[in-house]
From Swiss-Prot:
Its main location: secreted. Residues 18-52 form a propeptide. Keywords: Amidation, Secreted, Signal. This is U-myrmicitoxin(01)-Tb2a. The keyword Heme does not apply. The keyword Phosphoprotein does not apply. Expressed by the venom gland.
Length: 68
């Protein structure tokens, strides 16, 4: 197969794949409560992680100073 026919065949396959691909549509979530809950969960997770990290650092400092 010549190179020109190969590129034509690939272009045809590409166009057919685009034409017959399933149509997808993105929809925005309109539920404000779900967005607020997700934000609150993310904030709580971040706060818990920061608190655990702070406690770990504090324990290491106490261990270095010899306090229990």
């Amino acid at each position: 197969m010549k190179l020109s026919f190969l590129s034509l065949a690939l272009a045809t396959i590409f166009v057919m794949a685009i034409i017959y691909a399933p149509q997808m549509e993105a929809r925005a979530s309109s539920d404000a409560d779900a967005d607020a809950a997700a934000s609150a969960d993310a904030d709580a997770d971040a706060l818990a992680e920061a608190s655990a990290l702070f406690k770990e650092i504090l324990e290491k400092i106490k261990a270095k100073l010899g306090k229990k």
